[in-house]
Amino acid sequence: MMSQQDLPTLFYSGKSNSAVPIISESELQTITAEPWLEISKKGLQLEGLNFDRQGQLFLLDVFEGNIFKVNPETKEIKQPFVSHKANPAAIKIHKDGRLFVCYLGDFKSTGGIFAATENGDNIQDIIEDLSTTYCIDDMVFDSKGGFYFTDFRGYSTNPLGGVYYVAPDFRTVTPIIQNISVANGIALSTDEKVLWVTETTANRLHRIALEDDGVTIQPFGATIPYYFTGHEGPDSCCIDRDDNLYVAMYGQGRVLVFNKRGYPIGQILIPGRDEGHMLRSTHPQFIPGTNQLIICANDIEMGGGSMLYTVNGFAKGHQSFQFQ
């Protein structure tokens, strides 16, 4: 009989030596992002990257409510205003120039969306937290001026979240899919026939094929083409003009890329992830007219700062509603 010291023994080596090992996607085309801009030496929950028609980048800090504006050429960072609503999570820009800010509220029932100028003036409630129970994390405009939004409620065994469509007059809210666990990122295909949604705490990617009315799901059109692995899960996403989908993986320090059918075709790693740094990667977004992708991440858990990183994607970014 073997003594204990002679028994086969597991050792930390190779992938098992990483704080966030990549297993199922290890054979994908993989690149590592380069640092682009430090937003703060403090760990801030950066989110909501979006460019206006002048090419200025807007983003926010979820927990403190700061709205940032970055000049990509000079790298100058301004803070035009602070959200008056708790826990803003996304910024989308209307083609009239207004910022639409999604906010999570108390993470239970007091989320909503407000619109404001780039300086935070002329605030208008689009979806009021007093009259709904949504916890709104993200949204995407269609070409008609309506938008889809994600309801961030629930958890893995209590799927309260969903996806809804708001008509261009902002008066009618129509459910698209419901009973999902923390609906998070959302993107619309270039032809507006496919809606992508990430379900964070269930680690799933939804592909929803829509009829021409934009709210009816095609027969057998709601599918789950991909199941993610690891902690915590998929976050915000965006598309390029080839209809590839870029999904930030929160808690993993990387972005996964899928083709238009939902097959993984590449990944982007944030530097330091194997050592447990900058794991809170939340949102990818393209610089308008280019294939240059910006990714935000922070190092709150390790006491580090908040950064924007950059790579080149497969194709130029899709020119969404604000540029039409």
From Swiss-Prot:
It comes from Staphylococcus aureus (strain bovine RF122 / ET3-1). InterPro entries: 6-blade_b-propeller_TolB-like, SGL, SMP-30/CGR1_Lactonase. The active site is at D235. Disulfide bonds: none annotated. GO terms for molecular function: hydrolase activity; metal ion binding. The lineage of its organism: Bacteria, Bacillati, Bacillota, Bacilli, Bacillales. This is Lactonase drp35. SUPFAM superfamilies: Calcium-dependent phosphotriesterase (SSF63829). Binds 2 Ca(2+) ions per subunit. The keyword Hydrolase applies. Its EC number is 3.1.1.-. Belongs to the SMP-30/CGR1 family. Ca(2+) 2 binds at S109, G111, D129, T132, Y134. Its main location: cytoplasm. Ca(2+) 1 binds at E47, D137, N184, D235, S236. Keywords: Calcium, Cytoplasm, Hydrolase, Metal-binding.
